[in-house]
Amino acid sequence: MITSPLLAYVAILFFCVLKASSLDTFIAAVYEHAAILPDAPLTPVSHEEALMLMNRNLDLLEGAVTSAAKQGAHIIVTPEDGVYGFFFSRESIYSYLEDIPDPHVNWIPCTNPSRFGHTPVQKRLSCLARDNSIYIVANIGDKKPCNASDPDCPHDGRYQYNTDVVFDSEGRLVARYHKQNLFLGEDQFDAPKEPEIVTFDTTFGRFGIFTCFGILFHDPAVTLVKDFQVDTILFPTAWMNVLPHLTAIEFHSAWAMGMRVNFLAANIHFPLRKMTGSGIYAPDSPRAFHYDMKTKEGKLLLSQLDSHPHRPAVNWTSYASGLPTPLVGNQEFKSTVFFDEFTFLELKGVAGNYTVCQKDLCCQLSYRMLEKREDEVYALGAFDGLHTVEGSYYLQICTLLKCKTMDLHSCGDSVETASTRFEMFSLSGTFGTQYVFPEVLLSDIQLAPGEFQVSSDGRLFSLKPPSGPVLTVTLFGRLYERDSASGASADLVAQGLRVMLGVIITIMYSLSW
């Protein structure tokens, strides 16, 4: 019979061993991969031909994994679509898919590759992780048969999922995530019936995973942080940059800061589709990032992160709500930012305090420029409404931005360079949400690590003069509970815009091949 003192001793010993094996910091790696694409992605090929292409991409990923492991990385994230590319049909993607089991089966494909059928891609990823003693995050395709007993079963008798997989340092499959929020043009894949919440624990923290477009929605992204207390998000993506507020490095670093977690973003590298921008982001500042529209090369990033980052919560409306309500003046004007109509005020002096409102949101800006240039216009904008283009999601945004030209109606158009330097800025707003993501983007699409901070009362302010001219300073708020609060007319407009955007994206794809 085991006595209770002995049980207590064993429990204490186990706790001590567990604590001794845990790491306060770890080295993260992300790889922006320039994928080798199929010549004719809409044409079905044999599994052998598909595997040849995937192995060519895996050869490149192997080089990145090996290099990262030699530099001490504990985990590496690779991009969405990185193994086979994109723009497939439902039929043409099929030869690239494998059956990916639930990780609870406790499977190491490297040592038992035939347990779940023919799985050469999973075997290779597993062996790569095992041989290099590193966690590997990859994006591949899953297939699951179904039949008429399932009323949702697709016409071809199978579900096809855009899938993230994670193999641990022994090559064991420890996580599988089926992408929930499919983007326009992803008709080759099905969305799972319910959002999947996928986490796994390591000696260097708890990890959660989701893919690309999902960052704009509550589930699973926010749920992973709020309800499952993950320390680090793993984020394979094929992200098309959209200025002024949705470039990859800008928004992903802002999400890390707003949600107060580490964020490892690996983007595909394909400048013809405006796809670039990867990074390793901590809650207080970016640790490493890469944005390159000029070359065709991939890029490996590494940086050290805290295993359990802890940042204080922010009251995003505290400061701005204490300010007097401004009178609506005749200097306001309207201009469109990514199909949304903002209310703007032009910044007319070298320094000043401005407030602009739209609906329930008032945005307050204090700033000082080094000089007021005659050839550039900056404006303070507010938007409080439902965005209905590539998806429906409710936004509250306060933004200081450079206008494309001297014409005020160009405020919100895409612009990549600026010349105006700021000495300081402080931006706040009366947000109706706790989910606000602070962005600072400098000329030539560069971040400003260590140059700004968010206060506990909701101000985004500069710590020193920014190191480059400012493109935008933005507080990007999400009101998830109002995403479906659209009327019939808004739905009709959204449907038309989605069709138009889908046609544009299809044309972009076809021109790329």
UniProtKB/Swiss-Prot annotation:
<dbReference type="GO" id="GO:0098552">
    <property type="term" value="C:side of membrane"/>
</dbReference>
<feature type="domain" description="CN hydrolase">
    <location>
        <begin position="40"/>
        <end position="307"/>
    </location>
</feature>
<feature type="active site" description="Nucleophile">
    <location>
        <position position="212"/>
    </location>
</feature>
<dbReference type="Pfam" id="PF00795">
    <property type="entry name" value="CN_hydrolase"/>
</dbReference>
<dbReference type="InterPro" id="IPR012101">
    <property type="entry name" value="Biotinidase-like_euk"/>
</dbReference>
<feature type="propeptide" description="Removed in mature form">
    <location>
        <begin position="488"/>
        <end position="513"/>
    </location>
</feature>
<keyword id="KW-0449">Lipoprotein</keyword>
<feature type="glycosylation site" description="N-linked (GlcNAc...) asparagine">
    <location>
        <position position="353"/>
    </location>
</feature>
<feature type="signal peptide">
    <location>
        <begin position="1"/>
        <end position="22"/>
    </location>
</feature>
<comment type="function">
    <text>Amidohydrolase that hydrolyzes specifically one of the carboamide linkages in D-pantetheine thus recycling pantothenic acid (vitamin B5) and releasing cysteamine.</text>
</comment>
<dbReference type="InterPro" id="IPR043957">
    <property type="entry name" value="Vanin_C"/>
</dbReference>
<dbReference type="InterPro" id="IPR040154">
    <property type="entry name" value="Biotinidase/VNN"/>
</dbReference>
<feature type="active site" description="Proton donor">
    <location>
        <position position="179"/>
    </location>
</feature>
<dbReference type="InterPro" id="IPR003010">
    <property type="entry name" value="C-N_Hydrolase"/>
</dbReference>
<feature type="active site" description="Proton acceptor">
    <location>
        <position position="80"/>
    </location>
</feature>
<feature type="lipid moiety-binding region" description="GPI-anchor amidated glycine">
    <location>
        <position position="487"/>
    </location>
</feature>
<keyword id="KW-0325">Glycoprotein</keyword>
<keyword id="KW-0472">Membrane</keyword>
<dbReference type="InterPro" id="IPR036526">
    <property type="entry name" value="C-N_Hydrolase_sf"/>
</dbReference>
<keyword id="KW-1003">Cell membrane</keyword>
<dbReference type="GO" id="GO:0017159">
    <property type="term" value="F:pantetheine hydrolase activity"/>
</dbReference>
<dbReference type="GO" id="GO:0015939">
    <property type="term" value="P:pantothenate metabolic process"/>
</dbReference>
<dbReference type="Pfam" id="PF19018">
    <property type="entry name" value="Vanin_C"/>
</dbReference>
<keyword id="KW-0732">Signal</keyword>
<feature type="glycosylation site" description="N-linked (GlcNAc...) asparagine">
    <location>
        <position position="147"/>
    </location>
</feature>
<comment type="similarity">
    <text>Belongs to the carbon-nitrogen hydrolase superfamily. BTD/VNN family.</text>
</comment>
<feature type="glycosylation site" description="N-linked (GlcNAc...) asparagine">
    <location>
        <position position="315"/>
    </location>
</feature>
<protein>
    <recommendedName>
        <fullName>Pantetheinase</fullName>
        <ecNumber>3.5.1.92</ecNumber>
    </recommendedName>
</protein>
<keyword id="KW-0336">GPI-anchor</keyword>
<keyword id="KW-0378">Hydrolase</keyword>
<comment type="subunit">
    <text>Monomer.</text>
</comment>
<dbReference type="GO" id="GO:0005886">
    <property type="term" value="C:plasma membrane"/>
</dbReference>
